């Protein structure tokens, strides 16, 4: 049992979880966001999005100043009050976006893999793919430590591509809509553990953690949470955890922000 009155951190994915996959609406989650903010519970956004995108969304959601996890864990944006931490304001894990782009261009030219990265197109095209405005779409191209792409080849070639990336110290990760390439050492789980340890160091007590996500790339995050909400999503593979004890894991019946609200209701309303 736990409550929002005890030291608590909430880690949340964005698209398909806190945000509607199509409209990007988050209003069904608004009452819980307000309640958590009033209880001084940090809601830490965790996504494949760039830090530039997430800082914009963080402000929109009333979560500005809190830490966040961008680019599937390859980037940690530090909390405003953590200015004494080395690397402030952001910590980058592994190799840079530019280096990954060079690797991908070489693989495409020499081994003829078929894919389109966000670097290959303009913001108007990304806006068409995502439904974002052009100004918001431009923020999706500001990667620091990963590359986002659309795969346009066979499953067999994907397996070969994944193996080649692994040989080069990279990983190929599936998101709700797109695929992401980042350093093999990076991950939402490592980033979350770092943030948890930082809060513990600052407060002297390890906070209880609750994570919410809807896609395969959220599984590593949810695995390291004390409690997890698997929001019903669009991805056909879904989310599968090693420990799905009903006492710690809740699968929602609703999608997006309504599922997010359902998950919070499940763990807190009756407590």
From Swiss-Prot:
One of its GO terms (biological process) is mannosylglycerate biosynthetic process. One of its GO terms (cellular component) is cytosol. The active site is at residue 13. Its cofactor is Mg(2+). It is an enzyme of class 3 (hydrolase). Pfam families: Hydrolase_3. It catalyses: 2-O-(alpha-D-mannosyl)-3-phosphoglycerate + H2O = (2R)-2-O-(alpha-D-mannosyl)-glycerate + phosphate. Keywords: Cytoplasm, Hydrolase, Magnesium, Metal-binding. InterPro entries: HAD-like_sf (IPR036412), HAD-SF-IIB-MPGP (IPR006381), HAD-SF_hydro_IIB (IPR006379), HAD_sf (IPR023214), MPG_Pase (IPR012815). One of its GO terms (molecular function) is mannosyl-3-phosphoglycerate phosphatase activity. Mg(2+) binds at residues 13, 15, 214. It comes from the Bacteria. Transmembrane segments: none annotated. It is found in: Cytoplasm. Its EC number is 3.1.3.70. SUPFAM superfamilies: HAD-like (SSF56784). Belongs to the HAD-like hydrolase superfamily. MPGP family. This is Mannosyl-3-phosphoglycerate phosphatase.
């Amino acid at each position: 049992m736990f409550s929002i009155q005890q030291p608590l951190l909430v880690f949340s994915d964005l698209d398909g979880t806190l945000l509607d996959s199509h409209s990007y609406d988050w209003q069904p989650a608004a009452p819980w966001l307000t309640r958590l903010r009033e209880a001084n519970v940090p809601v830490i956004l965790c996504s494949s999005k760039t830090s530039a995108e997430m800082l914009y969304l963080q402000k929109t959601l009333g979560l500005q100043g809190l830490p966040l996890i961008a680019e599937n864990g390859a980037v940690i944006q530090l909390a405003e009050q953590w200015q004494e931490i080395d690397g402030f304001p952001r910590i980058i894990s592994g190799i840079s976006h530019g280096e990954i782009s060079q690797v991908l261009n070489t693989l495409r030219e020499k081994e003829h893999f078929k894919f389109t990265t966000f670097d290959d197109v303009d913001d108007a095209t990304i806006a068409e793919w995502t439904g974002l405005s052009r100004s918001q779409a431009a923020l999706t191209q500001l990667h620091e430590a990963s590359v986002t792409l659309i795969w346009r080849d066979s499953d067999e070639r994907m397996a070969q591509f994944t193996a080649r990336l692994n040989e080069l110290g990279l990983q190929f990760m599936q998101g709700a809509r797109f695929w992401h390439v980042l350093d093999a050492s990076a991950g939402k789980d490592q980033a979350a553990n770092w943030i948890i340890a930082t809060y513990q160091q600052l407060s002297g007590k390890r906070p209880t953690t609750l994570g919410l996500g809807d896609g395969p790339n959220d599984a590593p995050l949810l695995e390291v949470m004390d409690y997890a909400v698997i929001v019903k999503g669009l991805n056909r593979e879904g989310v599968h955890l090693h420990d799905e004890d009903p006492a710690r894991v809740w699968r929602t019946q609703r999608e997006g922000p309504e599922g997010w609200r359902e998950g919070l209701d499940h763990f807190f309303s009756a407590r």
